[in-house]
Design a protein with these regions (language model features):
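Acetyl-CoA-dependent GNAT
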Residues: 26-85
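Conserved beta-strand-loop-alpha-helix junction that forms the acyl-donor binding cleft
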Residues: 107-125
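Conserved acetyl-CoA-binding loop-helix of GNAT-fold acetyltransferases
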Residues: 85-101, 118
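Short hydrophobic/aromatic beta-strand or adjacent loop that forms the aromatic wall/cage
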Residues: 46, 146-150
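Alpha-helical elements of Rossmann-like donor-binding domains used by nucleotide-donor carbohydrate transfer enzymes
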Residues: 14-18, 91-95, 150
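Conserved catalytic-core motifs of GNAT/GCN5-like acyltransferases
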Residues: 127-146
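A short, well-structured alpha-helix characteristic of acyl/acetyltransferase catalytic modules
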Residues: 1-40, 157-164
Length: 164
């Protein structure tokens, strides 16, 4: 279940701190040895959620921005504090479906080594989206250049699938 991250600011910060300098954090921030914790804050264009289970335990974090002028949803961030928990994927894709129906365009990025990439590929294809491949855009923690992908789904008024 998605709940406003402001309700869980201290717990989210603590959980992120435990994951600094890890490969999982690299997948979240896009560069190795990242040490900038996400700021949980109130801003008009910023949406931040704690992903919680039935016991109200935090299993993940989701953030994105909405540009009202272009009606574009962008700057997604997703982090799992409980690897393999299906609640995270379920809540993410339910939110993406909602955003696709409501807004003109959504976009997000992923590095090629992120295991969730294959799920993003399927989701984007199901919605007739575009996948842009960028070569050698960043280095991993071992200094190897890796590729990244940008996903783009444009709602041109077509009927969206109700039950993916």
């Amino acid at each position: 279940m998605l709940k406003p991250a402001l309700l869980y600011t201290q717990e989210i910060t603590r959980k992120f701190t435990e994951h600094l300098y890890t490969t999982d954090y690299f997948y979240y921030c896009g560069y190795p040895c990242g040490n900038n914790l996400p700021k949980i804050e109130e801003k008009d264009d910023l949406y931040q959620y704690a992903i919680v289970d039935k016991n109200d335990d935090i299993v993940g974090f989701l953030t994105y921005r909405i540009n009202d002028y272009s009606d574009t949803v962008h700057d997604f961030g997703l982090f799992s504090f409980d690897k393999g928990n299906p609640i995270l994927g379920y809540d993410l894709f339910r939110k993406l479906e909602e955003l696709i129906k409501k807004h003109h365009r959504i976009e997000w990025c992923v590095v090629s080594t992120n295991p969730v990439k294959r799920h993003y590929d399927k989701f984007c294809k199901r919605h007739n989206g575009y996948i842009h491949h960028w070569h050698e855009t960043t280095k991993d923690e071992y200094g190897n250049y890796i590729d990244s992908y940008t996903y783009e789904i444009i709602n041109r008024g077509r009927q969206q699938n109700e039950n993916p």
